[in-house]
Amino acid sequence: MEIKIIQNYILYLIKDCGLSVSLHPFQDETLITGSTLMNFNIHDNSYCSYIKSLPNGHKECVSQQKKVFNQCCQTNENFCDICYAGVKEYIYLLHNKESIIGFVSVSGYACDNKEKYISFISEQFDCNLDSVSREYNKLKANMPDKKRIDTLILPLCKMLELAYLKEIKDPQAASLNEAICHYIQRHYSIDLTTDLICEKFSCSKSYFSHSFKSYTGKSFR
């Protein structure tokens, strides 16, 4: 399934349905990490952005996310949880047969005992209590009904799982696309052209154009 279709559906969930959706792949999963879907690898609410802006805030969030990965592997089912900073979220697992390849998060909701978390964050990062409280209160107060979220998010999970299966059926193409994406990222300051990339990776222009768009969801240049 085209990356662009998945991307458009996520944008629909965010803009039209008012959901804060983010994608969190495991390290060896390249469908998301090697495409424009990585743009959705972050919680977009102002409270989470505020915490990540604090000294060691981003590092702590990454560390805590590993615990979510572990919980995914232990439970092997979708669940609702509260992160260390007090943000309530739905977690939907992404599977490849018996293996878990990542998860989808629907986040950005305040919990009932917010004062405990606000105080904890203020002490943890040695920051102003009022500032933390002000940012926390920007979170959404009411969490949507799980049946509604299931109806919207489960199709996204299926799209991602099918796209992942399509990718691993052609590992050579996936590996080449991943290598090309990494090369472009490493040499972003150079005026890269289609000719240069095709020469570097010994592929035709037509193959590169079609494969790159299918893999990333956008045309090169």
Protein language model features and the residues they cover:
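Short helix-capping/hinge SLiMs at alpha-helix to coil transitions
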Residues: 186-190
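Juxtadomain coupling helices with adjacent low-complexity linkers
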Residues: 1-16, 20, 103-173
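Recognition helices and adjacent regulatory flanks at domain boundaries
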Residues: 172, 181-185, 198-199, 207
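Basic/polar phosphate-binding segments, predominantly the helix-turn-helix DNA-binding elements
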Residues: 191, 195-221
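N-terminal positioning helix adjacent to the helix-turn-helix/winged-helix DNA-binding module
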Residues: 172-180, 216, 220
